[in-house]
Amino acid sequence: MTATPSRPLTGRRVLVTRAAGQATTLSQELRQLGAAVVEIPAIAIQPVALPEDLRAAARSLRGHRPPRWMAVTSSNAVEALRALSLPEDLAGIRVAAVGEPTARALRDIGVNVELVAPGTGAGALADGLIGAGAGEGAVWLPQGEAARIELGERLGQAGADVAVTVCYRTVPVAGLRRLLIPALAERVDAVTLLSPSVVEAVIAAVGPDALCGLSLVCVGSTTAAALRRHRLTPVVASRGDAEGVAAAVAGALRR
């Protein structure tokens, strides 16, 4: 079949490496553009914080002087927040998120999101929160074990009382090399790698040479930097949602 303007990925094969249960929307977008999609989760998400830990953190935040903010940088953290009694546990707490996908995940569990920072970087969220006066109050950061410290540091420097709860960790999927090698051997045109932990898991499994010559589509400067550390060239999507990533894949393979 020949690619058309509406289906530019016809005849192309794209490897999607998102965690199990998180690839559906992206895979649908890619298929709508004509791609043959191979889903191989590179990482698994493991909860760390107990529900009572999250409730205690929310209760502690409510005891601070306003403004009180909860800042969420990943949809993985949203899954952990399902343990809260919503919206009661977040009464009086303003909520900020990095990127529309994370904001959408929060809204899906009944959380009103007041501030959405563009892109995927913590820097933009820090700017938004500081601009909204968060430095005069308290900020709770429910986040992953490997989350960068930039957001908390900047908020603290601005005067905020910052509390961090590690609520999940990412781990490589067992037997990942055994899954990836045959998929890559069958010809892959592009790979989506949407977090540094995914990059490291894939590289540890097959090595950087296995990805040379492929379009490596990522989201955000942190993930792009992870690829560059392995001397790989990233294609950085301008938007972090599924439609934006799929468009970046199509753009990369059109060149």
Show which residues each predicted segment covers.
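Signature of uroporphyrinogen-III synthase
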Residues: 1-255
